[in-house]
Amino acid sequence: MCTAVTYQAAAFYMGRTLDYDCSFGEEVVITPRKFPLPGDYAVIGMAHVADGYPLYYDAVNEKGLGMAGLNFVGNAKYRQPEDGRCNVPQYALLLRVLRQCATLAQARAFLQTVNVTGEPFGQYPAAELHWLLADRTGALAADRR
């Protein structure tokens, strides 16, 4: 089980646990502004890099919006791709949101347009996730049940 928390005092804090008894090769990863993906914001967080792509566990962008992908085993449900929708595989959602959204309000609006799919990344199975998003204005939990 993974846990995430936020705390607002003089500054905003966000943290999470990664409750595994082994390592999956996670490391601190920076995705710069000019990375060849949609969006404009730089991102830093914990990720496993596979085939040059950062598979983020959690991260924050340069505007202060943070997001964590948390295990939701047995409860996560993803949809099939739909024509005319913004189809985003579950492994790409965190990076897509943080690259494109500066605030929690923007992230909430963007998530209303997204169809989260269960497409796996290479040989990795689709992770069963829900997400915590937060900035200094508040927090929200997102899932696709």
Regions found by a protein language model. Give the residues of each.
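A contiguous strand-loop segment
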Residues: M1-C86, T113, G118
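Second-shell loop/turn segments in exported
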Residues: D83, A92-L98
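Accessory structured domains or lobes within enzymes
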Residues: C101-R145
